[in-house]
Amino acid sequence: ETDTEAYICYGRIIFMKEELRIDIVGLAGACSYALDCIEAELVNITNKHGKRVAYISVCMAEYWAIQGEALQDLAMCALLHDNALTQYISEELKKDSVIDLKKDLSEEKTNLHCIYGEKNITKLPFKTDVSNVILYHHEHADGTGPFQKKWNEIPLFARIIHLADIIDIIRNSIDSDDNSWDFMCQYLSQNKDSLFDSECVNAFLHVFTKESFMCLSDDSFETKLWEAIPREKLVFDWEMCKDVADFFAKIVDYKSSFTSRHSIGVAEKASMLAQYMGYDSITVQKTVSYTHLRAHETKANL
């Protein structure tokens, strides 16, 4: 939703009203869908994986009475927990076009996409401190994860997302029948205090029943997810618009480094032109942001 109008007149971009209001959670949901499509294509992860991880995480949050801005930030982190997957894939494919991506992602280079992902989300407008949530979301409670951090060194949100992530991956790999809930409970019990900390295991078993767990196999969970998350539109300045566009660029452009360079190059040229024409710094930011956003909107519709 925007109260800003922009149009081009004789080579000049004219901006009207100043406010740009964006539903950042909805934007994260759209980004999650793009990531899911790529994961389904490359590593055979189930569709809507990010949204399921977010739903499981939001449900678990009830155990700690997490609400408001903190709940919104947890949902965003969960939706975008694998935001650097495409960036990592792109770099690995440049090195070796025949690598086994599924094996490579799961066994050897998990820490890289966590590092990239942590850096990427600094561009997004979180309301609370989410430092190290993405970085440590693959850590094990006993300290055997990629960074060898034990559960008491890991942010709660990272621990929640880690359990939710594994739950959905396992749920997708087993038959969805009457025995799947019992299998999951047994798995959590066997890996309590090793893969997962006992507090998160208790939280999951406290909020989920066999019936609610089985509902993860259909699309009804998505409606419940959006009902549970606070959805407040944020007023974006033009610098934030550019940061968000940069974040999307790393995902949308993973198959072609040219499209990424092209849209960034166009934005840079627009900035130079606006400065040459004597516009102030705010108008220059608007020009760059609008050009960036339009470029990615065009590519997303192709």
Listing of model-derived features with the role each one plays in the protein:
Residues 1-15:
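Short, Lys/Arg-enriched N-terminal segments with co-localized hydrophobic residues
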Residues 17-18, 74-78, 121-162, 176-177, ...:
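Histidine/acidic-rich helix-loop-helix segments that form or flank divalent-metal centers
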Residues 24, 39, 80, 157, ...:
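Signal-transmission coiled-coils
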Residues 30-49, 95-101, 245-261:
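Active-site flanking loop/helix segments enriched in acidic
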Residues 43-74, 139, 145-153, 256-287:
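Alpha-helical phosphate/pyrophosphate-handling elements in metalloenzyme active cores
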Residues 52-61, 113-121, 180-192, 196, ...:
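An active-site-proximal "capping" alpha-helix that borders the catalytic cofactor pocket
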Residues 159-171:
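Conserved beta-strand-loop-short alpha-helix elements that form
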Residues 291-298:
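Conserved small/polar residues in nucleotide/adenosyl-binding loops
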